[in-house]
């Protein structure tokens, strides 16, 4: 209860600044990339409940989600993948041409995650906690996923602080 109070209080305090950035980024994306400006994806949250995660769209509209899924599953199975042929390959897909120039900047600055504040206000997420996984990711974590899902997922957490997507599956 105290954590939820903290999350909502922080979001409300920073809401004027958040709204300014949301509006500016939204208009810029609308002009540069067109609609849709938001990327909505089902994620696994607390108690393994599914919820819709909101982010700014950073990829071309034609980007296939199965591309990431197959890459991720190959990593999880220990298959050797490009570019270093190491099973400890970070999750990030290097030189991913599906990512727009604007999207690359938003990702680097973590501004693509700004719409996650709506998930905090809806009670699906917290400010700090483990990142919510996509369903096919959560299935691979087994018992560890039960621990992850015992708390609300967060906008930021230990993995983001320690190395973001440059961490391998084993290091996450």
Question: Language-model features: where?
Answer:
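Conserved small/aromatic sequence motifs within transmembrane helices
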Residues: 1-14, 18, 22-172
């Amino acid at each position: 209860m105290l954590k939820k109070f903290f999350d909502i209080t922080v979001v409300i305090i920073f809401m004027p600044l958040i709204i300014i950035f949301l509006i500016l980024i939204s208009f810029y994306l609308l002009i540069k990339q067109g609609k849709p400006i938001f990327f909505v994806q089902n994620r696994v949250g607390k108690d393994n409940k599914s919820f819709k995660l909101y982010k700014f769209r950073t990829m071309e509209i034609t980007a296939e989600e199965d591309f990431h899924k197959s890459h991720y599953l190959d990593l999880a199975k220990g298959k050797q993948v490009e570019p270093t042929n190491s099973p400890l390959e970070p999750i990030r897909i290097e030189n991913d041409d599906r990512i727009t120039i604007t999207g690359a900047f938003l990702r680097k600055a973590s501004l693509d995650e700004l719409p996650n504040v709506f998930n905090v206000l809806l009670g699906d997420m917290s400010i700090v906690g483990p990142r919510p996984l996509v369903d096919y990711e959560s299935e691979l974590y087994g018992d560890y996923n039960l621990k992850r899902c015992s708390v609300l997922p967060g906008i930021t957490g230990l993995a983001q602080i320690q190395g973001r997507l440059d961490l391998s599956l084993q290091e996450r």
